[in-house]
Amino acid sequence: MSKIFAYTVGTLGTARETVPYAYTNSAWKDQLTSYDGESITYDASGNPTNYLGATLVWEGQRLKSYTPKDASSGRANSYVYSYDENGIRTRKTIGSTVTDYYYNGTLLMGTVKTTTNSDGSTTTSKLRFSYDADGKVVAVNYNGNYYYYLRNAQSDIVKLIDKTGATVVEYRYDSWGKLLSTSGSLASTLGKNNPFRYRGYGLRDLRLSCLLSGSSFTVGWSRTLLMLS
């Protein structure tokens, strides 16, 4: 059975923005070498090593460290990552803050974030996650209280609510998954530390890319960054 759809033809408006993409590697023709006039360099495995003055160091396809342009002047912190033998991240260090990740198999069960303050004291934040029978995260325990994840039709985490149903965190994304805003009474604490957001995937906050289904996909570039087997 066929259907006929009627379309109208209008005049295209003026482009709001033009962003040039360049592919100048003759040996790897689909490798993005420049985005909006900013060059991107790679190692022999196709991992990006420099972009916007930032330096990325890789061990195979595991990102070991990310150093922003301003790190040398002390205006930004470097990111250092540790992994287990299966390539799952177990620790993230950003300046004086260390976050440890705990798993049951491949399920992230909890995180412990410890910050060493200037006076030598430490501040600790703990998150413990609960899952349903299908392995989908449904709740998080933060400071002894449970909060529950709400998703939209695309499985994006859009809210966290407390036991009364009140919204404590709300996320807004654009169509590419870039986080536009975080609001709510716990936005700066639970909202910031919660690793589950777009599509419900665990956040990989590399500042350059986010991990989606095994491919490193840059939100700004709207394309796959790494060639993964």
Predicted regions and their residues:
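Short, hydrophobic/aromatic-rich segments at coil-to-beta transitions
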Residues: 86-91, 107-110, 194-197, 209
